[in-house]
Amino acid sequence: TPGWERNVSDSMLEALANKGGVLQINFGTAFLTDVNDKSNSYNPSTYIHAEVTDVADHIDRAVALVGIEHVGIGSDYDGVGDTLPNGLKDVSTYPNLIAELQNRGYSTSDIQKILGGNFARVWREVEEYARNN
């Protein structure tokens, strides 16, 4: 969401990628879309939830900016409460995101990187650094 202060800027994302890091896409609606007035508290009767396509849009944008090697998912299932996108309410619904990414032309290898491969790569690098320093 442009202008949402908790999202990283393009320059921050580029700096992260230049150091080999991975941006984890958050599933909270406020991070994905500006359809709700952020100055108001969450009201279940009026809240408009993001969609799986909004998550995929964020993935697309990050991949276009810094490449597939620097994008992952960090759902924040335990932190955003009932602001999760329609179709991504828990891990059992990941096939919805996978299907959307496939429809957008992502390969199996790319999807594996997004779903955890990139994070695992960075984790291995951190462990190796810790062992050697």
Label each residue range with its predicted role.
Residues 1, 30-34, 79-82, 120-122:
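Flexible loop/turn segments at secondary-structure boundaries
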Residues 1-9, 40-49:
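Glycine-rich tight-turn/loop motif centered on a GG-T
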Residues 5-21, 53-69:
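Histidine/acidic residue-rich metal-binding segments in metalloenzymes
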Residues 20-28:
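A conserved active-site cap/scaffold subdomain adjacent to cofactor or substrate pockets
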Residues 23, 76, 111:
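Conserved, mostly hydrophobic/aromatic
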Residues 26-27, 66-88:
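Short acidic/histidine-rich active-site segments
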Residues 35, 43-52, 81-88, 101-113:
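Outer-membrane beta-barrel pore domains
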Residues 89-133:
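Mid-to-C-terminal alpha-helical segments outside catalytic/metal-binding sites
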